[in-house]
Amino acid sequence: MSVKGKGFPLDLGGSFTEDAPRPPVPGEEGELITTDQRPFSHTYYSLKNDGIKNETSTATPRRPDLDLGYEPEGSASPTPPYLKWAESLHSLLDDQDGIHLFRTFLQQENCADLLDFWFACSGFRKLEPNDSKVEKRLKLAKAIYKKYVLDSNGIVSRQIKPATKSFIKDCVLRQQIDPAMFDQAQMEIQSMMEDNTYPVFLKSDIYLEYTTIGGESPKNYSDQSSGSGTGKGPSGYLPTLNEDEEWRCDQGGEHERERECIPSSLFSQKLALDSSSHCAGSNRRLSDGREFRPGTWREPVNPYYVNTGYAGAPVTSANDSEQQSMSSDADTMSLTDSSVDGIPPYRLRKHYRREMQESANANGRGPLPHIPRTYHMPKDIHVDPEKFAAELISRLEGVLRDREAEQKLEERLKRVRAEEEGDDGDVSSGPSVISHKLPSGPPMHHFNSRYSETGCVGMQIRDAHEENPESILDEHVQRVMKTPGCQSPGTGRHSPKSRSPDGHLSKTLPGSLGTMQTGHGKHSSKSTAKVDSGNLHHHKHVYHHVHHHGGVKPKEQIDGESTQRVQTNFPWNVESHNYATKSRNYAESMGMAPNPMDSLAYSGKVSMLSKRNAKKADLGKSESASHEMPVVPEDSERHQKILQWIMEGEKEIIRHKKSNHSSSSAKKQPPTELARPLSIERPGAVHPWVSAQLRNVVQPSHPFIQDPTMPPNPAPNPLTQLVSKPGARLEEEEKKAAKMPQKQRLKPQKKNVSAPSQPCDNIVVAYYFCGEPIPYRTMVKGRVVTLGQFKELLTKKGNYRYYFKKVSDEFDCGVVFEEVREDDMILPIYEEKIIGQVEKID
């Protein structure tokens, strides 16, 4: 049963037409039917063979790329060819559609000659080397040479190497036509396309749009491939169709032309806008109350046009709108309405979601096909193995050198740390941290530091050296003298730890104030001495100087204050201990003790100053009043603090040199009071800047830190002090000596009679740095100091000139500053000091 007429092939290539035949009835797949002649008033297809009998099977559209000519029922769909194009360049060039799409891309990039030259070389190589075709091969070789190789401005000629050009030229001139004469040039062009144009093509808009719409976009050429069908139909997504409108071919053409003008980046946005306008139009029609029922079209969806990448309206609207149009309550129960007849939108949400999923499965409009990432061979795979091995070896050697350098650096750092730890081990063999053994009581954040100091005095601590506290002090002084290099303490630092030898606690301290006997016997003196000697905390062998000269309070006032402090019964914990240590360290860091030996002997003399009568107390008050300064502006107050700090430090050095003190006086002084005022409590014992520091705890203790204009100091030694003018120091010392009573002046000489004499193997080094008015002072081991050792003391490295003061009769003044240039030269000594000037070389 066949008739002659205008027929059209059934292979539509996945395109949709309104005249497409329906799928056959099961069991009649092999029956041949004829296509009826129909008038196509608005069709897109150009029908070619008029009057030719066209007999086809309506079972399955023919697919010439398959073995059987069609896809068997139940078989899985193969990978689309446009996804195989991303595997390699050869996969792209083996497919006709891929070649057309790639050529279109190259034409847009003005480099289509690359692909033409590649195919020309392939065709030339396939020519049979017969004698009859020699002339044809020669003409073809000359044409390829003139069009692509000889033209120096062409893109192919620019990509071919000069050696390859000369080889092809020689072959053409000598007429030695070889089928492989263009192979080298073809490989160079192919390599260039694989590295440049092919990856760019895979990321281009034309390829991405082609894969997104399921391989329909580029089929608008006049020369279609064999698998593309013979007709030119609408390609890509179908336009959005509202419920009350009818789709027309010319409307689809308008949408198609509009889509071609839209970039691929804006294509998805247009779909979203179309979808939203569709929903808005549906809601508008519902609100107007119009009822539209297009008819009873209940045929199932054509399975041959399902899952082709069409993205029409949303899934629920596409399927459920058809079902709702058939019902009588389509206007009141439409799912596009947010209220759904007054039912809250959150009710039966799971049920609606399930229905939406079922509708999606029924429509078959799942997500768009997945585009796999392109897998390319590594670029280094074409490298010569010898070059690759050489480059790899050089890189591995570089890595090995870096690792060896890191290992050497780590070893050096370990040695430096071991040396530092060895120095620390010589000083403290068994450190005892009091703050770690204290019971955890409730923290007291707001209290005066003197209360914590008093609580520390009131403790009973048992020591391994309980019967001989002088040995602790002697050993401590010897250890500190061996290692003078350390940092001076301050309130800004952490709480220093106890480094007394074998000074561990036999039992933890109680949470409140310890009770002590109120008698004036020997046991009271011992226990009190133990407390102070056990609480000598040091931060890396630091000297602590306790200022205890000046006036004291009357005895009645001291008794009243001590009674009040005992009645407060505040807990002694880690926080209070830290505050006490910080307050003591502040007074000690100011350098207020006469010398280091005096500060150590102070711990054994708990109540030495309590013997003074009211007359001496008044004298001390007047003396302390003479030290107080009037209220001055902030800058002048800072400078005054610095000057007073310098003078006090120099007084301590002079006292340390002139007097030999002993710590044995700690035993000989009988205590008269248990609770004695400490240096911070006594009004005459604190200098004006210390009093200001106690009033304003926020300010740092170091005077230089308060002034941001001052340069930062290097880390000083424990004996480091700033040097001031000798005349001012001597005058201040004479004034103090004149005011001090005779008995008090003789006391320092009586203290350290039994103490060992301090070795004098250190020398003072002071230097003025780059014209600064205040010199830097430090102590260096040994009496012989070279210029190289002096340079190590400088914290700022650079090109300097070094001048040192020495005695000379060359000038009237008797002294000169001599320049020293060699690092091994010994520096001159002037008045038991090395005084130098460091000047920067411009």
From Swiss-Prot:
Region of interest (Disordered), ranges: 1-75, 218-242, 277-297, 316-344, 414-451, 482-532, 543-562, 615-637, 656-675, 729-754
Lineage: superkingdom: Eukaryota
Localization: Cytoplasm; Nucleus; Membrane; Cell membrane
Region (Interaction with GSK3B): 348-433
PROSITE patterns, alphabetized: DIX, RGS
Ranges of compositional bias, category Basic residues: 543-552
All copies of domain RGS, residue ranges: 88-211
Ranges for domain DIX: 760-842
Keywords: ADP-ribosylation, Cell membrane, Cytoplasm, Developmental protein, Membrane, Nucleus, Phosphoprotein, Ubl conjugation, Wnt signaling pathway
GO MF entries: beta-catenin binding; I-SMAD binding; identical protein binding; molecular adaptor activity; protein homodimerization activity; protein kinase binding; ubiquitin protein ligase binding
Basic and acidic residues: bias regions: 615-626
SMART domains noted in UniProt: DAX, RGS
Any one cellular-component term (Gene Ontology): plasma membrane
InterPro entries membership: Axin-like (IPR043581), Axin_b-cat-bd (IPR014936), Axin_TNKS-bd (IPR032101), DIX (IPR001158), DIX_dom_sf (IPR038207), RGS (IPR016137), RGS_sf (IPR036305), RGS_subdom1/3 (IPR024066)
Region of interest (Interaction with beta-catenin), ranges: 434-508
SUPFAM superfamilies: Regulator of G-protein signaling, RGS, Ubiquitin-like
Keyword Cell wall biogenesis/degradation in annotation: no
Keyword Cell wall biogenesis/degradation: no
PTM (free text): ADP-ribosylated by tankyrase tnks and tnks2. Poly-ADP-ribosylated protein is recognized by rnf146, followed by ubiquitination at 'Lys-48' and subsequent activation of the Wnt signaling pathway.
An example Gene Ontology biological process: negative regulation of canonical Wnt signaling pathway
Gene3D superfamilies, A to Z: 1.10.196.10, 2.40.240.130, Regulator of G-protein Signalling 4, domain 2
Subunit: Homodimer. Interacts with hwa; leading to promote the tankyrase-mediated degradation of axin1.
Cited function: Component of the beta-catenin destruction complex required for regulating ctnnb1 levels through phosphorylation and ubiquitination, and modulating Wnt-signaling. Controls dorsoventral patterning via two opposing effects; down-regulates ctnnb1 to inhibit the Wnt signaling pathway and ventralize embryos, but also dorsalizes embryos by activating a Wnt-independent JNK signaling pathway.
Protein name in the entry: Axin-1
Gene: axin1
